Amino acid sequence: MGDSFDDRFPKPQFRDRFPAANESFVQRQSPDAPRRRTAQAEPAPYQVASLAPTAPYQRPAREDQTTLVSLKSSAFPYLGNNPRTDEPFLNISKGDRRGHRSYGGRVYWQDETYNDNRVLMHVPENFDVRKPGVIVVFFHGNGATLERDVRDRQLVPQQISDSGVNAVLLAPQLAVDAADSSAGKFWQPGGLKRFVAESAEHLAGLYGDPGAAKAFANMPVIIVGYSGGFVPAAWSLEVGGLGNRVRGVFLLDAVYGELDKFASWIVNNRSGFFVSAYTRYTKRHDNELVQMLKEKGIAISEDMDGPLRPGSVVFVETPEGVTHRDYVTHAWTENPVKEVLVKMAATPALTRMAAGAASS
């Protein structure tokens, strides 16, 4: 069988790609999941200045909060160099348009593919900023948009809510609906740190308590990368600047390269966990990474039966018939993002605030 982009991503039906106007902003639910309605965050109530004592800010009751926010620190637009070639990322022009010629020779234009700085943010209704929690940073794969794929098809916000774990989501738009894994600003030193820092006030607003920004600014981070999301995931581990705030890495059929960066993080960060689930498309690279780790004396598990602890390294092969396109919802189990979060939450050390996080 082939291993082309079309093999891994068979074209969906028209309805899958272009939902009707009246359902575009509705978060789709699995049949057995409780129904939730996405609501907008309530603005803070207007208050008149007073010398008298006032009650502390009370966060209004709310439901799941899911929205798109533009961030300067998101992956694109990106005007820097491609670190693989040390040449400008935008390496082709036509009139006033600038674009990027990919390794496969295809040209993608900045105004169509690399100009969306929006981030999908999600705060579950039961999230409590006063308790230990994590920020899940999700790097999507090729041929994706945040609404159609990450939210509605892969159900990443819903998986986080359904896990019951005290977690929020940040999912930056990478190359829009393109066969391109470029990391943009996540290639840059400190890129992930700036991204999470800029997100803090927006997450606090979505949560309904502006005072929660400090907690979000110091919260531990879990990186999830699907397919082509391996590039920003790897570079975020290598140069992202978050140090031991990154408590876990979960790759979904995503080990297509950057093995040295993943191996280095695993060897040097024994306080976090690493999980890679894979199909035949990435099996060769996963096996190569396993061998690299064994040579460094790292113990490897080959199933998800046990708990996730600091230092856990797990590689899970999934059988034939499990498709790459549906892997974010159907891997070794249904809703694997939910499964990993549940196993992570059973180990308090993984969600405890890192020492010195406020200054990291």
Model-derived regions: residue spans:
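C-terminal catalytic histidine-bearing segment of alpha/beta-hydrolase fold enzymes
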Residues: 46, 55, 276-360
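Active-site machinery of serine-nucleophile hydrolases
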Residues: 130-205
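A domain-start/cap signature at the N-terminus of enzymes
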Residues: 3-134, 301-302, 352-359
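Short glycine-enriched nucleophile-adjacent loop
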Residues: 230-241
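Extracytoplasmic/secreted cell-surface and envelope-processing proteins
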Residues: 146-148, 178-181, 231-233, 257-262, ...
